[in-house]
Amino acid sequence: MATNLRGVMAALLTPFDQQQALDKASLRRLVQFNIQQGIDGLYVGGSTGEAFVQSLSEREQVLEIVAEEAKGKIKLIAHVGCVSTAESQQLAASAKRYGFDAVSAVTPFYYPFSFEEHCDHYRAIIDSADGLPMVVYNIPALSGVKLTLDQINTLVTLPGVGALKQTSGDLYQMEQIRREHPDLVLYNGYDEIFASGLLAGADGGIGSTYNIMGWRYQGIVKALKEGDIQTAQKLQTECNKVIDLLIKTGVFRGLKTVLHYMDVVSVPLCRKPFGPVDEKYLPELKALAQQLMQERG
């Protein structure tokens, strides 16, 4: 059902203007930039997209704009997860209407929901998605929901679930999931272990830094398919040098600043309460943008 969703999917950033409103022009440029750099698809409205500091209406606007701009050129996954099941269902219905290829939802968080309540939440969203496959989003570090392997196995076998975004450093668990579910579309979620995730059984990945250097991750996929471990390791190391800097600057604002220097994003600001990048990092981020533009050619 979801086999065509395999690949390298950028977790799309959401640009804002100086007044903190959606910057629709920059969003369109960012979609085109990702298409041009050879990304297989976009994961829209997730953690990287700052979904949880946006209104429901804004999240729907983002989905609509991305769908218009992508025009069937790449695969589109709409993250529709909210704490509220009803709001998640509304976004899922919108994703279906706009022509997305799949929906995704993080486990509902903040309140200590039971596992059966998690399952019911996903069933309701799947129903509203009207045939679109569900990508279960497991990110325990941010959601606070620590699913056991048995619980993951249950979620990914719910009717309508076609994939799992596994944002965890537990590569043993990644391998266990792959072993148990050989046909499941399985995404690596942490960019810094992309190559290791593929070796542990992931089909591809969904990541934030793909927005600025997606071709490197495609290079890792190609190298591993050819059995060239040395090249894959080298590319992962180069990616991780960038990630080291972004962790210091704040990942989302750092990425937006790099894209600003690449003339893709007009204003390199995140939605408050996120603050701006510390000015001391601007020279490094500008140099990184120049390096990546030269590398991409």
Curated annotation (Swiss-Prot):
pH-dependence note: it reads: Optimum pH is 6.5-7.0.
Q: What effect is documented for mutating Y137A?
A: Loss of Neu5Ac cleavage activity. Is still able to form a Schiff base with the substrate
Outcome when changing S47A? 21-fold decrease in catalytic efficiency for the cleavage of Neu5Ac
Control of this protein's activity is summarized as:
Inhibited by reduction with NaBH(4), and by Cu(2+) ions, p-chloromercuribenzoate and N-bromosuccinimide. Inhibited by beta-hydroxypyruvate. Co(2+), Mn(2+) and Ni(2+) stimulate activity, perhaps by enhancing the opening of the substrate Neu5Ac.
Residues annotated for aldehydo-N-acetyl-D-mannosamine binding in this entry = T167, G189, D191, E192, S208
Residue sites binding aceneuramate per the record:
S47, T48, T167, G189, D191, E192, S208
Q: What class of enzyme is it?
A: lyase
The record's section on CDD domains has: NAL (cd00954)
Catalytic positions are: Y137 (proton donor), K165 (schiff-base intermediate with substrate)
Q: Where does pyruvate bind?
A: S47, T48
This protein's record includes keyword Cytoplasm? yes
The induction field says:
Negatively regulated by the transcriptional repressor NanR. Induced by N-acetylneuraminate, via inactivation of NanR.
Instruction: Give the PROSITE patterns listed for this entry.
Output: DHDPS_1 (PS00665), DHDPS_2 (PS00666)
Q: Name one GO cellular component term.
A: cytosol
What GO molecular-function term can you cite, just one?
A: N-acetylneuraminate lyase activity
Record keywords: Lyase included? yes
Q: What role does it play?
A: Catalyzes the reversible aldol cleavage of N-acetylneuraminic acid (sialic acid; Neu5Ac) to form pyruvate and N-acetylmannosamine (ManNAc) via a Schiff base intermediate. Experiments show the true substrate is aceneuramate (linearized Neu5Ac), which forms spontaneously at alkaline pH. Linear aceneuramate can be provided by NanQ. Can also cleave other substrates such as N-glycollylneuraminic acid (GcNeu), but not colominic acid or 2-oxocarboxylic acids such as 2-oxohexanoic acid, 2-oxo-octanoic acid, 2-oxo-3-deoxyoctanoic acid and 2-oxononanoic acid.
Assembly and oligomerization: Homotetramer.
**Under what name is this protein listed?**
N-acetylneuraminate lyase
